[in-house]
Design a protein with these regions (language model features):
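Conserved C-terminal "switch" segment of AAA+ ATPases
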Residues: 1-84, 95-102
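C-terminal engagement/docking regions of AAA+ P-loop ATPases
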Residues: 63-158
Length: 158
């Protein structure tokens, strides 16, 4: 899984200065397309890599042979992949095209990217409900412990 710096590098391949950028975003960065694209990439990384209740996805209880059991929380960042990052940018591009066709400003914006992150997170919530503890062990790279339980976190778990 990419860390925040690696995620920003991956996003640099997908969210480039030559893409249509929201006019308000460009104005906020003095018309500098590179600075605008870099700022938008940071928006995505900050939304994905924040460690708070909004980004908490799963609570995993693992069995350990020596110490018993432990519980940890996985956040969006723990599940982020290059494919997810590309999908977020793609969703935001689609939203900007739809907005422009409807008479709006169009172009990539912080708001559209945050919405794309939220949509991708919801899609991951759907996946978490259909995956076994063994599948999660493979996904998160847990080989030294056995996953006893996986509990979905977020809006639907309260």
């Amino acid at each position: 899984r990419p860390d925040a710096a690696a995620a920003e590098e991956i996003l640099a391949r997908h969210l480039t200065a030559d893409l249509p950028l929201d006019p308000a975003e460009l104005t906020a960065h003095g018309g500098d397309r590179e600075a605008t694209a870099a700022s938008l990439r940071r928006v995505v990384v900050e939304a994905l890599y924040a460690r708070n209740e909004a980004t908490a996805v799963l609570e995993i209880t693992e069995a350990h042979t020596v110490s018993g059991a432990s519980t940890r929380v996985l956040h969006l960042a723990d599940l982020t992949s290059g494919a997810m990052l590309a999908a977020i940018v793609s969703r935001a591009k689609t939203a900007s095209i739809k907005d422009e066709l409807a008479g709006g400003a169009g172009g990539l914006s912080a708001a559209r990217l945050r919405l794309a992150v939220e949509t991708e997170a919801r899609q991951n919530e759907e996946i978490t409900g259909a995956t076994t503890p063994e599948g999660w062990a493979r996904l998160i790279g847990t080989r030294t412990s056995q996953i006893l339980s996986v509990r979905r976190l977020g809006k639907e778990s309260t």
